[in-house]
Every structure is written in C-alpha cells, then in structure tokens.
C-alpha cells in the first residue's frame, strides 16, 4: 500500500517572504473521507486516478482500501487527508460499517450510465445516517462517474442537482476516472467544506499507529 509521507520542512525568512516551520513530529489535523456507492460505479478507479493518476479497467477493492496524503496548511493548521474505499458487496457490509467511525465526510458515487446506481443514492444516504456515529456532522458530496461514455449517459444533470438540492448535498456531475475529467475538483470541494466546518481530528505522530495496527493488509487495490 502506497502512502505519501510528510518530509521535514525548514523555515527561510527574508525581507519579503516567510516559510512556515514544520517537522514530522508536529501534531496535524486529520480529515477522514469515505467513498461509497454501488458496485461498478468506479470507486476504486476514482481513488486510483486521484492519488496515483492511473487508470486500469477492472480495478476493485477487496473489502477496504485507503490512502493518506498531505493536504497542507489552512489557517495555521497542517492537514492530512485519509480517503477510504470500501467494498459495497453485502458480504463485506459488517466489515465496512466499522470504518464509518470517525468519518468527517462521504463521497457518494453513481454511474452516469446506470439509472439504478443513481436511484440507490438514497440507500447510501440512509447508510450514513444509520451507521455513521458522526452522521449529523458529516459532509456529503455526490458525483456522477463515467461521463466519457457520452452516448450512454442516462442521468440528466438537472435531475441530479435537484435530488442533491432536496437533500442539501453538493452535487458534481461530469467526472471520468478513465479520461481523468474533473477528478480533483469534487475532492477539493469536499475537503474545503469539512475544514471550513472545523471537522477534523488532531493527531500526534508519536501515537499515530492506526495504519500499522488496524488495517487488514489483504485489503488493497488490485
């Protein structure tokens, strides 16, 4: 499993510029996001494209996978982002529910060419409400993947926006993991909304053993 790590930064102060001092032992703010949606909507592909800028047909998660990356300084605090891709199969459901704990935001994904995946968005919203301990404070963004399949699109962007507006949820149509269309924007929107609300977890690197002790090593993107 790949993970970006923070390197030690130094401070250089000149007459016109000042760089912020930060090292690996400093506390940071962690934002945890979970990607949800029906099978074959492209959740693993979206995560792979966003983090590694790669695309491979047939990629899927086995149970749970995650990436962690540096986000940067916001209002004097240093942020890291943890994004989880959880398998939506029923046989993994009990496992994946446990990873909802501590989530600050959710990205709900549907397939622009699959009406059922759009219809099931309400199911995933209910999952968050019923299974996430922090659902009242969670931020949600809904995106439609596979917009590159122009001739097969079945979901009207207006209909998608109307649904999201009725739920007070941000919508972001026209995303393609395959063609790398608008991949960064919905993640950035979600992160900004979470940080603006002040929803994050302060982490001390000296005690940050979560990845080493709690991740099932077989749950990787393959």
Swiss-Prot record:
Residues noted as binding GTP in the record, renumbered to the chain: 37-44, 85-89, 145-148
Annotated GO biological process: vesicle-mediated transport
Lipid moiety-binding residues (S-geranylgeranyl cysteine): 219
Keywords, sorted A to Z: Cell membrane, GTP-binding, Lipoprotein, Membrane, Methylation, Nucleotide-binding, Prenylation
Residues carrying Cysteine methyl ester: 219
SMART domains, alphabetized: ARF (SM00177), RAB (SM00175), RAS (SM00173), RHO (SM00174)
Species per Swiss-Prot/TrEMBL record: Dictyostelium discoideum
Protein name: Ras-related protein RabT1
CDD domains found in the cross-reference section: Rab (cd00154)
Membrane topology listed for this record: Lipid-anchor
Sequence similarity: Belongs to the small GTPase superfamily. Rab family.
Subcellular location: Cell membrane
PANTHER family referenced in this protein's UniProt entry, alphabetically: RAS-RELATED PROTEIN RAB
Pro-peptide positions on chain: 220-222
Renumbered ranges of motif Effector region: 59-66
A single MF term (Gene Ontology): GTPase activity
Keyword Membrane included in the entry's annotation: yes
Signal peptide, first to last residue: none
UniProt-listed Gene3D superfamilies: P-loop containing nucleotide triphosphate hydrolases
Coiled coil is among the record's keywords: no
Gene Ontology cellular component annotations, sorted alphabetically: plasma membrane
């Amino acid at each position: 499993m790949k993970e970006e790590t923070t390197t030690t930064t130094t401070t250089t102060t000149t007459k016109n510029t000042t760089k912020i001092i930060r090292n690996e032992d400093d506390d940071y703010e962690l934002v945890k996001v979970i990607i949800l949606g029906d099978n074959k909507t492209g959740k693993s592909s979206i995560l792979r494209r966003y983090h590694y800028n790669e695309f491979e047909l047939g990629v899927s998660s086995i149970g749970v996978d995650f990436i962690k990356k540096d986000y940067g300084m916001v209002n004097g605090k240093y942020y890291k982002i943890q994004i989880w891709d959880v398998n939506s199969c029923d046989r993994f459901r009990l496992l994946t529910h446990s990873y909802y704990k501590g989530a600050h935001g959710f990205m709900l994904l549907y397939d622009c060419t699959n009406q059922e995946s759009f219809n099931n968005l309400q199911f995933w919203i209910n999952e968050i409400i019923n299974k996430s301990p922090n659902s009242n404070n969670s931020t949600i963004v809904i995106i439609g993947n596979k917009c590159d399949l122009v001739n097969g699109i079945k979901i009207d962007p207006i209909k998608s926006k109307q649904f999201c507006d009725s739920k007070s949820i941000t919508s972001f149509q026209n995303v393609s993991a395959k063609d790398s269309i608008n991949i960064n924007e919905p993640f950035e929107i979600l992160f900004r909304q979470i940080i603006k609300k002040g929803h994050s977890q302060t982490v001390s690197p000296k005690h940050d053993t979560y990845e080493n002790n709690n991740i099932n090593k077989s749950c990787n993107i393959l």
